[in-house]
Every structure is written in C-alpha cells, then in structure tokens.
Amino acid sequence: LMEGAKAKDVEDFLKSAIKGTEWENKVFAVGGFVRDEIMGKTPKDIDVVVDKIQGGIEFTIWLAKKVGTYKEGSNPTIFPTFGTAKMVLDGVVHNGVDLSGEDLEAVMPRSEQYHDSSSRKPTDIQFTDLEGDAKRRDLTINAIYKNVSTGEIVDPVGGMEDIKNKVVRPPSDPDLIYTDDALRMFRVIRFANRFGWELTP
C-alpha cells in the first residue's frame, strides 16, 4: 500500500508515461484514490482501469518494458481470468521521487457473474465499458473514474452526488451485488460507520 503523496506521484508518473502514446485517455484512476481526492483526503494508493480488452495486462507489460523493469512471469504479475495485472514500481524514479515499494494494479473494465453462490470467484467475465464496470463495484463512491491524462471525472452511477450527500449505496441492484459477494456487505457497513454516513438499501 502506498503512503500519501506517493499515490499522487504515481498518477503523475502514469500521466507522463502515456502522453502521446496509444494509452493516452485510456487509463482511469478508480476507487479509493478518486473517492479520497474528492473528499479532500490524501489518497493512499492508486488502482487503474484501462479501457481496452485485456487493457490491464497489456498496459502493465507495456509500462514495465518502457521503464525497464519487465520480468516475464513476475513483473507484472498477471491474473488472466480477470484481465488484471499488478506491477511493482521498484527502481522507477519520477520527478526526483523514488517510486520503489509502490505497486500499481490495473484492470480492464469488466462485468462479472457469480453462478455459484458459495464462491467469491466470478464465473463469467466480460469486457465492458466504464458504465458496466461501475455497476459491478461495491459502492457508487468507489465507482468514480478519473482520466489520468486529462483529470476529467467520469461518474456513471452518481458517486459524486452520494459523496456530497454522505450516502453509501450500491451502484446497481443490491441483491445482485451482495448475493455475488457477501464480503462486500461487510465493507459497505464498514464504510458507512467509518464516515458516519447514511446507508441506503
């Protein structure tokens, strides 16, 4: 996990790394990073959605090669089922800040189906757009996207409004989301308690 300013440094590093490349305007910060920023807190770590089929995987491989830290099979670590990859930023220095010890998780926008109610593993994963991706997330406030290249906010399920009104709610049918994943239920309650916000079914 990243501390304070480092997450912003990673965002800045990403912005300059993708400038003028095929990845420009395809990389979006999401989740806690965007939520904390909007709430005026210092983001702790950064996760990104890369808007392309297998984008998370292709992007981190490209990035690791670009900065010279690519190691087949270990950096990035790849989770092919989910179209997800995790890259460590050891040895990367950006604007005089050493990003060693930070990591970057990148995913493609995806929709998920859980057919086996006893399992937390989705069985059917499809590439989708940001709106589809937002709907699979646990809370609207964690489903706000920030274009790393432009800073533009994409808010498909009304997360900004919910932050303003201090409301914690799921982005789509709660039964669907929480049947999918009971652990999420606990996260939601934890969030509501942490911020002292209202829980909306």
Listing of model-derived features with the role each one plays in the protein:
Residues L1-P201:
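Catalytic cores of the polymerase beta-like nucleotidyltransferase superfamily
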